[in-house]
């Protein structure tokens, strides 16, 4: 029987080797609880130093929802790439779809966002994930995202 835990944690060094994204568009700090069922949790520490806060909004900073969706997609990409075994390991992830997206609560500087992602489908190199972004256990956003893993 396969163990439910495949990797316990992917740190920032591994994320940098896995994803092509860099500052200011690398939007996850680590991925924890990656499991054999292709689920895991991306972690983003939101600080006032985020470039988006310069214009969103200077008097009342709110972390942009679209950046949370990108954080979900990056988390899904790490989960997908780290789950592929052998020499066929993909080297790139392309974000393809966003469905059923909802923003529920604002995210502010000082919040720690957890992107709870789980695979809901796969066909060849295409993967689909459902994601719930949470702060202190409360859902702040949710979406289904699709991606293609490729060379």
UniProtKB/Swiss-Prot annotation:
<dbReference type="GO" id="GO:0005737">
    <property type="term" value="C:cytoplasm"/>
</dbReference>
<dbReference type="InterPro" id="IPR029069">
    <property type="entry name" value="HotDog_dom_sf"/>
</dbReference>
<dbReference type="InterPro" id="IPR013114">
    <property type="entry name" value="FabA_FabZ"/>
</dbReference>
<comment type="similarity">
    <text>Belongs to the thioester dehydratase family. FabZ subfamily.</text>
</comment>
<dbReference type="GO" id="GO:0006633">
    <property type="term" value="P:fatty acid biosynthetic process"/>
</dbReference>
<keyword id="KW-0443">Lipid metabolism</keyword>
<keyword id="KW-0963">Cytoplasm</keyword>
<dbReference type="GO" id="GO:0019171">
    <property type="term" value="F:(3R)-hydroxyacyl-[acyl-carrier-protein] dehydratase activity"/>
</dbReference>
<comment type="function">
    <text>Involved in unsaturated fatty acids biosynthesis. Catalyzes the dehydration of short chain beta-hydroxyacyl-ACPs and long chain saturated and unsaturated beta-hydroxyacyl-ACPs.</text>
</comment>
<keyword id="KW-0441">Lipid A biosynthesis</keyword>
<feature type="active site">
    <location>
        <position position="56"/>
    </location>
</feature>
<dbReference type="InterPro" id="IPR010084">
    <property type="entry name" value="FabZ"/>
</dbReference>
<keyword id="KW-0456">Lyase</keyword>
<protein>
    <recommendedName>
        <fullName>3-hydroxyacyl-[acyl-carrier-protein] dehydratase FabZ</fullName>
        <ecNumber>4.2.1.59</ecNumber>
    </recommendedName>
</protein>
<dbReference type="GO" id="GO:0016020">
    <property type="term" value="C:membrane"/>
</dbReference>
<dbReference type="Pfam" id="PF07977">
    <property type="entry name" value="FabA"/>
</dbReference>
<keyword id="KW-0444">Lipid biosynthesis</keyword>
<dbReference type="GO" id="GO:0009245">
    <property type="term" value="P:lipid A biosynthetic process"/>
</dbReference>
């Amino acid at each position: 029987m396969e163990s439910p835990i495949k990797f316990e944690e992917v740190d920032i060094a591994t994320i940098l080797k896995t994803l092509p994204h860099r500052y200011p568009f690398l939007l996850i700090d680590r991925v924890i609880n990656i499991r054999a069922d292709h689920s895991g949790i991306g972690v983003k520490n939101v600080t006032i130093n985020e470039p988006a806060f310069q214009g969103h909004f200077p008097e009342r900073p709110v972390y942009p929802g679209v950046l949370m969706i990108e954080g979900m997609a990056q988390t899904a990409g790490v989960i997908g790439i780290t789950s592929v075994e052998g020499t066929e390991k993909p080297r790139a992830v392309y974000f393809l779809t966003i469905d059923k997206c909802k923003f529920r609560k604002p995210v502010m500087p000082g919040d720690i966002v957890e992107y709870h992602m789980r695979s809901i489908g796969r066909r060849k190199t295409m993967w689909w994930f459902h994601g719930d972004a949470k702060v202190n256990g409360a859902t702040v956003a949710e979406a289904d995202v699709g991606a293609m893993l490729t060379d």
